[in-house]
Amino acid sequence: MDVLSVSEINAQIKALLEATFLQVRVQGEVSNLTIHKVSGHAYFSLKDSQSVIRCVLFKGNANRLKFALKEGQEMVVFGGISVYVPRGDYQINCFEIEPKEIGSLTLALEQLKEKLRLKGYFDEANKLPKPHFPKRVAVITSQNSAAWADMKKIASKRWPMCELVCINTLMQGEGCVQSVVESIAYADSLHDTKNAFDAIVVARGGGSMEDLYSFNDEKIADALYLAKTFSMSAIGHESDFLLSDLVADLRASTPSNAMEILLPNSDEWLQKLDGFNVKLHRSFKILLHQKKAYLEHLADFLKRLSFENKHHLNALKLEKLKIALENKTLEFLRFKKTLLEKISTQTLTSPFLQTKTERLNALENALKLAHANLKLPQFGAFLSKNNQAIELEALKRGDKIELSNEKARASAEILSVDRV
């Protein structure tokens, strides 16, 4: 038996292993994962409960992965055994990697969902409210599709006042994602302009999962999330649930269903308006009756108030006239009395003058008695100074006065007088 060097034996092992295990499929758990930022190569180990084997995934193959490789994932790798002669190491040079129980597309979608969930793309708090009565709606679909024809038909029946605008878009195959993203951006660019859309509806009919899978793309999700206009996703049939359905402000099971959800039913609203009209008419009649009754009550009150004010003013005028008459009469009597006092005592002895004096005194006493017994209004009182009637305008500060009526008598001092 020939003696071999280490290099020779490793070279023979390399030739044997690489020829024998040219293509292998190996299942195990990913561990010790390292991804080089510069080269883009990924190095990791694949292990089970008893053994470990090193693996390498070079950049070109790594770029074809539809999901992110992470530690702890149960994977099936497809590749070939390669031997590094200087160290006598061997590893699996991976060409493809797939999840053990689900496909790579499914795993990639789940990872993307988690990424967008953490960014808040699915949060209800970030959803825009559905417009109540949309006037202008952008429909992103193929203008020759059955979906567009169905949507126009339903919209014309439900809410003919709404203008549907079709933005012709490639809805499957290569270039679909970019076409949809550009159409969403165009429709949303009119936001806050006179031609703004109240809603954007991304719609297409059913198809295979391969046909619909473009609507699981992150770029479409970004376009819907960043749009300032309310958006709806209406892709496929009710059983089809895509990433665009989760990100859009509202999901419809089909394009036709989108019109039923978005647009109000004009027949139902006409019935509601009829009901509102009846209620409004009834409420108006009740309100009119109440206001009429209130105005009648107010008119009666004003009439009573006017009568009472007039009565009060007349009473004040009468009282003022009585006081003026009394003052003039007393003034006249005092004048006559003064004249009589100037007459000599001898003259007063004449029977004629004696009779007149007695008559004058009798009149004065009668007037005072009438003054004492004069009936005043319940709110009034006689005003006098030094037992003589006086007008209010004649008073000055410091005067001591008497107030009296048939029930009481009071004294007072004038503190101030304001002239009107």
UniProtKB/Swiss-Prot annotation:
GO terms for cellular component: cytoplasm; exodeoxyribonuclease VII complex. It is found in: Cytoplasm. It catalyses: Exonucleolytic cleavage in either 5'- to 3'- or 3'- to 5'-direction to yield nucleoside 5'-phosphates. PANTHER family: EXODEOXYRIBONUCLEASE 7 LARGE SUBUNIT. NCBIfam families: xseA. One of its GO terms (biological process) is DNA catabolic process. The keyword Magnesium does not apply. HAMAP family: Exonuc_7_L. Heterooligomer composed of large and small subunits. Bidirectionally degrades single-stranded DNA into large acid-insoluble oligonucleotides, which are then degraded further into small acid-soluble oligonucleotides. CDD domains: ExoVII_LU_OBF (cd04489). The keyword Hydrolase applies. It is an enzyme of class 3 (hydrolase). It comes from Helicobacter pylori (strain P12). This is Exodeoxyribonuclease 7 large subunit. GO terms for molecular function: exodeoxyribonuclease VII activity; nucleic acid binding. Keywords: Cytoplasm, Exonuclease, Hydrolase, Nuclease. Its main location: cytoplasm. It comes from the Bacteria. Its EC number is 3.1.11.6. It holds the Pfam family tRNA_anti_2.
